[in-house]
From Swiss-Prot:
Belongs to the oleosin family. Its main location: other. The chain crosses the membrane at residues 39-59, 73-93. It is found in: Lipid droplet; Membrane. It comes from Arachis hypogaea (Peanut). This is Oleosin Ara h 10.0102. Keywords: Allergen, Lipid droplet, Membrane, Transmembrane, Transmembrane helix. One of its GO terms (biological process) is seed oilbody biogenesis. Expressed in seeds (at protein level). The keyword Transmembrane applies. One of its GO terms (cellular component) is membrane. Signal peptide: none annotated. The keyword Membrane applies.
Length: 150
């Protein structure tokens, strides 16, 4: 048996930077325009987000208008407890609806912006990068197997 107490050196070989950077430090994808999927995401995401923000604004305006109209009527023409319960319930429902639509719209905008700013390449580029990494790992494992066998 061989003595295994000696330390072994590990060699790491890299082929390219993580986010498409080349050895010169420039992005090789910078000269390209937005991909088709990004354009489609913007075209579909912005109207959806804008529509949801519009619904949030309409729900808020409707809630405030309803409160402005119904509060004096309830105070003048009916007992106190039932209308107060209805007013509070409707106002809470309106504000929650407005907030939910607003958060949904802002989340849509945030998702679109994150998708646009995404620095990863397209699927074929990611597959090519994965192939290179697998080839590097296979070469490393082969070299280590030869080293251990000697």
């Amino acid at each position: 048996m061989t003595d295994r107490t000696q330390p072994h050196a590990v060699q790491v070989h890299t082929t390219a930077g993580r986010f498409g950077d080349t050895a010169a430090g420039t992005n090789r994808y910078a000269d390209r325009g937005p991909s088709t999927s990004k354009v489609i995401a913007v075209i579909t995401g912005l109207p959806i987000g804008g529509t949801l923000l519009l619904f949030a604004g309409l729900a808020l305006a409707g809630t405030l208008l309803g409160l402005a109209v119904t509060t004096p009527l309830f105070i003048l023409f009916s007992p106190v407890i039932v209308p107060a319960t209805i007013v509070v319930g409707l106002s809470v429902a309106g504000f929650l609806t407005s907030g939910a639509c607003g958060l949904t719209g802002l989340s849509s905008f945030s998702w679109v912006m994150n998708y646009i700013r995404q620095t990863h390449g397209s699927v074929p580029e990611q597959l090519e990068m994965a192939k290179h990494r697998m080839a590097d790992v296979a070469g490393y494992v082969g070299q280590k197997t030869k080293d251990v066998g000697q």
